[in-house]
Curated annotation (Swiss-Prot):
Name used for this protein in its record: Gamma-glutamyl phosphate reductase
Record keywords, A-Z: Amino-acid biosynthesis, Cytoplasm, NADP, Oxidoreductase, Proline biosynthesis
Pfam families: Aldedh (PF00171)
Predominant place of localization: cytoplasm
Protein purpose: Catalyzes the NADPH-dependent reduction of L-glutamate 5-phosphate into L-glutamate 5-semialdehyde and phosphate. The product spontaneously undergoes cyclization to form 1-pyrroline-5-carboxylate.
Gene expressing this chain: proA
HAMAP family from the UniProt entry: ProA
InterPro entries per record: Ald_DH/histidinol_DH, Ald_DH_C, Ald_DH_N, Aldehyde_DH_dom, G-glutamylP_reductase_CS, Glu-5-SA_DH, GPR_dom
Organism: Streptococcus thermophilus (strain ATCC BAA-491 / LMD-9)
Family: Belongs to the gamma-glutamyl phosphate reductase family.
Catalysed reaction, written as an equation: L-glutamate 5-semialdehyde + phosphate + NADP(+) = L-glutamyl 5-phosphate + NADPH + H(+)
Coiled-coil annotated residue ranges, if any: none
SUPFAM superfamilies: ALDH-like
Length: 416
């Protein structure tokens, strides 16, 4: 029996044990986990410091190190997120629909757990607890495989959660951590159809592509965000400037940060020089511009074709000038990762056309792409942002981690 077989078998058994936990029992456990995280902050920070030291030695950028960093305040924030999940309405057992058919059968469709969820993710150790809390709230067992760069932090966080489960008399195998960070073990998890009911990858383009190519278990694709801001010829340019600055600079290392700026030719001569000046007062951003934009920006560099398809996760932004709304939409649909896209315009009909025609999970009018988030959307915590169309799309909250079952009651009916 392989390492993944052992984890999978334990998760399968655990999923059956926790399937019948009441809402009250689940909420109580989650609140205990939140308390334990705060109480164990020193231990978690000590383990996190090992990852930060390794990241520094390995030349990982300061922006990416910030994604790894756990402070007392950040741990308190993770704990608060767990409490908020406890406060969310429990979807398990909810009736989706109920009716009596022509044969007199009473048919009720209810939400039920998935069973065993596996998650492969990179950096950001808070994901381990976010994922556990959502999985547990929906009566699912979860197997977590984090990145090598956050191995000590993830291990510490999962250890705290497992200890809280054990203290509550609930199987600790409701959450398991894959300590082997080899690609071979990750790929074995991708094909563990005997145990895993759903796999969620959360990370960069390379991880997502690997999972798409190799997974045999059902997958919800998440994460990669080559997000665009299109500044239309009817835009309020002051508003557009603030939206671009926020979407690019507030937190560039996250998937809902803007990576590409598309500008209508009619306003480009006024907008781009002013944007460049305004953004430079806040943060140094490298603009990689097409030929027309390059002539208008003092410090821009020429863009390569690859730049328009790149999720930079840094203070870098590609710039494209277009001659029409249709060209903007076609351009964005060519390079989008179907995450979040935005238009800035005062023309309602053009805004509606953009929202209808752009193929993305979240399409904004006159707002920053940075709002694509489960809490912001009122869904509570999220396990990721789905960029595909089947089962779930956009921020995935509790309902995305459920399946449904039909309950049929009869009185001796037979089919003729």
């Amino acid at each position: 029996m392989t390492y993944v077989d052992t984890l999978g078998q334990q998760a399968k058994v655990a999923s059956r044990q926790i399937a019948k936990l009441s809402t009250a029992a689940k909420n109580d456990l989650l609140n205990q986990v939140a308390k334990a995280l705060v109480a164990e902050s020193d231990y978690i920070i000590t383990e996190n410091a090992k990852d930060i030291a390794n990241a520094s030695e390995n030349g990982i950028s300061k922006i990416m190190q910030d994604r790894l960093l756990l402070t007392e305040d950040r741990i308190a924030g993770i704990a608060e997120g767990v409490r908020q999940v406890a406060d969310l309405q429990d979807p398990i057992g909810q009736v989706v629909r109920g009716y009596t058919n022509l044969d007199g059968l009473k048919i009720v469709q209810k939400r039920v757990p998935m069973g065993v969820i596996a998650m492969i993710f990179e950096s950001r150790p808070n994901v381990s607890i976010d994922a556990f809390s959502l999985a547990f709230k929906t009566n699912n067992a979860i197997i977590l495989r984090g990145g090598r760069d956050a191995i000590n932090s993830n291990k510490a966080l999962v250890t705290v959660a497992r200890k809280a489960l054990k203290n509550a008399g609930i199987t600790a195998d409701a959450v398991q951590f894959v300590e082997d960070t080899s690609h071979e073990v990750a790929e074995e998890l991708m094909v563990a159809t005997k145990y895993v009911d759903l796999l969620i990858p959360r990370g960069g383009a390379r991880l997502i592509q690997t999972v798409k190519e190799k997974a045999k278990v059902p997958v919800i694709e998440t994460g990669v965000g080559n997000c665009h801001i299109y500044v239309d010829k009817y835009a309020n340019l002051d508003m557009a400037t603030q939206i671009v600055i926020n979407a690019k600079t507030q937190r560039p290392s996250v998937c809902n940060a803007a990576e590409s700026l598309v500008v209508h030719a009619d306003i480009v001569e006024e907008f781009l020089p002013n944007l460049e000046k305004a953004i430079s007062k806040i943060q140094s951003v490298e603009f990689r511009a097409d030929e027309r934009a390059l002539k208008l920006m003092e410090k821009a560099v020429p863009a390569s074709p690859e730049d328009f398809a790149t999720e930079f996760l840094d203070y870098i932004m590609s710039v494209k000038v277009v001659d029409s709304l249709d060209e903007a939409i076609n351009w964005i649909n060519t390079y989008t990762t179907s995450h979040s896209e935005a238009i800035v315009t005062q023309d309602i009909s053009r805004a509606e056309q953009f929202q209808d025609d752009v193929d993305a999970a979240a399409v904004y009018v006159n707002a920053s792409t940075r709002f694509t988030d489960g809490f912001v959307f009122g869904l509570g915590a999220e396990i990721g942002i789905s960029t595909q169309k089947m089962h779930a799309r956009g921020p995935m909250g509790l309902e995305a981690l459920t399946s449904t079952k039909f309950y049929i009651n009869g009185q001796g009916q037979i089919r003729e």
